[in-house]
């Protein structure tokens, strides 16, 4: 039972950690190598793509999506999608996809004359499931070792979440101590008393 309890809570916290890792913004220092637009047919991985943008037909099973190709300082390639989030989840309220694509196109550079940018995004890159992180903004930085800045939004959100979890835990402990534990103790005492009575009755029967 103890093992099942640990497995349950580890699973819950793993899901929570994955949720925050996917949803919260992250910053990469990259060099933009190309930008393009591609028609995407959405399948089982559709949950990792944004809904159709404002003014688009939401009933279509495919649509054109902007992409931003980049290369990190260490040489590895990273491809980002560039989609509006609109009023949906996650709540980035992004409506400037076209402007961001134009900005990315203007910041393209070669390895001979690199121009590095800080690219803020959320989501994961997984080649097997064909999912891409979604770019939300970018700005020019001095070089590949430039600071990514302090993630104030992440700190505030995680602090508020931790405070909420702690508050719920404290109230649950108080409720358990005042309501559940006494009830369980009464049930256990009543069961023990009935068991003792039954044992006494059985002993008296055996003596006759």
Question: Can you say where each PLM-predicted feature lies in the sequence?
Answer:
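Hydrophobic secretory-pathway targeting helix
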Residues: 1-34, 153
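Glycine-rich loops and low-complexity Gly/Arg-rich segments
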Residues: 92-94, 104-107, 142-146, 161-166
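Alpha-helix initiation/capping motif
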Residues: 97, 122-125, 151
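Extended, hydrophilic extramembrane loops/domains of integral membrane proteins
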Residues: 103-145
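Juxtamembrane interface at the cytosolic side of transmembrane helices
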Residues: 4, 145-208
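A composition-biased, non-transmembrane "mature-region" signal
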Residues: 43, 48-58, 110, 131-134, ...
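Membrane-proximal low-complexity regions enriched in glycine and acidic/polar residues
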Residues: 26-108
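Intrinsic disorder/low-complexity segments enriched in polar/charged and small flexible residues
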Residues: 11, 15, 51, 89-91, ...
């Amino acid at each position: 039972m103890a093992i099942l309890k640990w497995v349950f809570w580890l699973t819950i916290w793993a899901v929570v950690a994955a949720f925050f890792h996917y949803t919260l913004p992250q910053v990469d220092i990259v060099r933009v190598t190309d930008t393009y637009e591609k028609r995407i047919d959405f399948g089982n991985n559709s949950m990792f793509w944004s809904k159709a943008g404002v003014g688009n037909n939401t009933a279509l099973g495919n649509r054109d999506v902007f992409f931003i190709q980049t290369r990190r300082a260490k040489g590895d390639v990273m491809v980002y999608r560039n989609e509006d989030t609109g009023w949906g989840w996650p709540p980035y309220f992004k409506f400037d996809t076209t402007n961001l694509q134009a900005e990315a196109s203007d910041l393209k550079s070669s390895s001979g004359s690199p121009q590095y940018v800080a690219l803020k995004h959320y989501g994961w890159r997984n080649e097997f499931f064909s999912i891409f992180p979604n770019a939300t903004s970018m700005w020019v930085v001095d070089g590949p070792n430039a600071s990514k800045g302090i993630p104030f939004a992440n700190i505030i959100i995680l602090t508020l979440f931790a405070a909420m979890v702690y508050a719920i835990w404290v109230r649950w402990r108080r409720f358990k101590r005042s309501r559940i534990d006494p009830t369980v103790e009464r049930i256990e005492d009543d069961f023990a008393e009935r068991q003792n009575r039954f044992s006494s009755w059985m002993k008296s029967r055996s003596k006759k």
